[in-house]
């Protein structure tokens, strides 16, 4: 897949996704929590792929600097950043109770 080979951010997201899936297996999260987790992980990948597509199309259309080209790239990157922030919040809500209970010593 082109994005995995070329985009540093997607590699980071793959790493985080693997960590989150590992934590989910360890904490034995519920089916609903799995659904939420996969929606968030999938959403992040989709946003990053769209961001990459927009950046590449902008680069294809113009080799010169243009304020609208910069705006298009910045807006696409901002969408990825906003979704990443929302993903962190969801992760804290999802895993916070499990981590707290684990630190107290009540989980396996």
Language-model segments: which ranges?
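Short helical (or helix-break) motifs at transmembrane helix termini and adjacent helical loops
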Residues: 51-56
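Amphipathic, cytosolic membrane-interfacial segments at TM-TM junctions
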Residues: 58-75
